[in-house]
């Protein structure tokens, strides 16, 4: 399903992106839980055991290097089970806070339908350009890629009345009626 454009945004995640996120989570977890230990220590351990002798390695070898670097095989096993073999995401908000980065709502107090780049005015019509992300207000309303938004809260959406203008008159949590055309029908 990852190559199917009809729901790609909800089904595809690059393992490069995921791996970078898991590594960031691991580095920050090490920095907060193990005095003086960082991901660099794990990478040096991997180099010592696999780089100099040029030996191939697998996930279990990296887990073992983490266990040696931290001296805590239970931690290594639980981290790998949750985030490498599993599908959980590290607790980025609390981990990044330790690094001085605060995660929060992009526009608190402002109404939102989903990524504003999902909707574009094309030829006088407001078109949903990409599949709405699962859980977003557009997704919950039933909008899909290629749908044409006709009205929001009874206001016709056209060149004179934009989606942004209607949303600015509302607050987060407001329920806004959406009239739209999907696959030729309303």
What function would you assign to each model-found segment?
Residues 69-70, 99, 141, 170:
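Residues at alpha-helix termini
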Residues 23, 80, 124, 173-175, ...:
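Active-site lining segments that contact anionic ligands and/or coordinate catalytic metals
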Residues 108-151, 155-159:
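PDZ/PDZ-like domain segments forming the peptide/carboxylate-binding groove
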Residues 91-98, 103-113:
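Extended alpha-helical interface modules used as scaffolds for assembling large macromolecular complexes
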Residues 9-13, 64-66, 138, 165-166, ...:
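Generic recognition of flexible, low-complexity loop/linker segments
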Residues 144, 150, 156, 161-186:
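PDZ-domain C-terminal substructure recognizer with occasional recognition of PDZ-binding tails
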Residues 2-97:
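Amphipathic alpha-helical substructures
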Residues 24, 44, 60, 64, ...:
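Solvent-exposed, polar/charged alpha-helical surfaces in well-ordered, non-transmembrane soluble domains
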